[in-house]
Amino acid sequence: MNGHFFISKLYDIMTCKKEYKNMKLQLTLNSLALILCCGDLIPSSTQPISTQEWQGIEKKLKSVHKEPSMITGMSIDTLTQIIGLDEFTAHKIEKRQKLLPDLFYALQNLENQDIGVTTIYEEDYPASLRVLGTKMPLVISYIGDLSLSYGVNISVAGPQMMNKTMRHVTKEIMKKISKEGYTVVVGGSKGVEELALRTQLTNNGNAVLFVADHMFDKIRLYSKYIKQNKLVIMTANDPYALFDVTHALDKNLYICGMVFAQIVTGTHIGSGPVWFTSIQNIHSHWTRQLVYETLDYSGNIRLIEMGEAHFTDEDLKSEVTLAEILDNHETVIKKDDPSIDQMTIFEFIEETHE
């Protein structure tokens, strides 16, 4: 496949402005090359290039002053001898090149269903995700007004099984969030996240639903709010994807990157995604965490012991803002404090369930 053929084909997919109604995809050549090589939009037995592999390819291309788009029209000899890629990677790229017609079909199909696509090479890619560095998703599919994700965001996470107290706490948190004008970012799990999302939308607030699977089910469920430009649904995976535990955990990481703070209403030690993400967040410093002070959840107790900011029922009733609560209740943990590493080794594997 030569470069002229690739560019002429890419031109066919580049159209006008993105909008929810009659979505028209507008993607740069670099983005299309990235989606072709790394995206999972194309059903194929040919494995996509991993994020880590792509980052290595980018470095090689930059060293010889080449754009990512040029890689798709290169032969194996050019990829190995001029770009400096190894034979294995070059052959993977060659196999992906042959999927170009399938890519156009997949993008056209998404466009017909008002699904937009953006990548790290596009100006509309959410800037907040770039704080994740090498862990940020390369490709995002979405429906709705993507600019909803550009504001000051906050996430709410907690157990999927709620008791009366947890339901009350979540509703009180949402009152503060609504009053302070934040955009809520959630992952769509049942329980606390679902309640937070529905409450935010009912209160006419803005929301981002970042999912890892079953995107079209969520679109049907929340189509009213998408049309009202109050909700954008996003995914870093194929919109048709089914549940995958790795994708689910990655999605939680992306949510952390998008928000200035994550509110944890309840989690037990070693219990699941909320606990696992909270611990990862402590290690990686993706965002600040605000944990509900309660004796009912072992994970909450441990997170607060480890220095995470906490809030009480009195805080929820007060006029103090969430940002002020974060500042007032945050503890600084010394770098040589061994408790974090000890916890992840011994406590994370406990079989407590939310």
Can you describe what each PLM-predicted range is?
Residues 1-22:
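N-terminal amphipathic/basic-hydrophobic helices that include classical n-h-c signal peptides
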Residues 4-5, 53, 87, 310, ...:
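Intrinsic disorder/low-structure terminal segments
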Residues 15-121:
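Short, small/acidic-rich helices and loops at N termini and domain boundaries
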Residues 16-48, 74-75, 113, 119-354:
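Glycine-biased, small-residue-rich flexible motifs in mid-sequence functional cores and linkers
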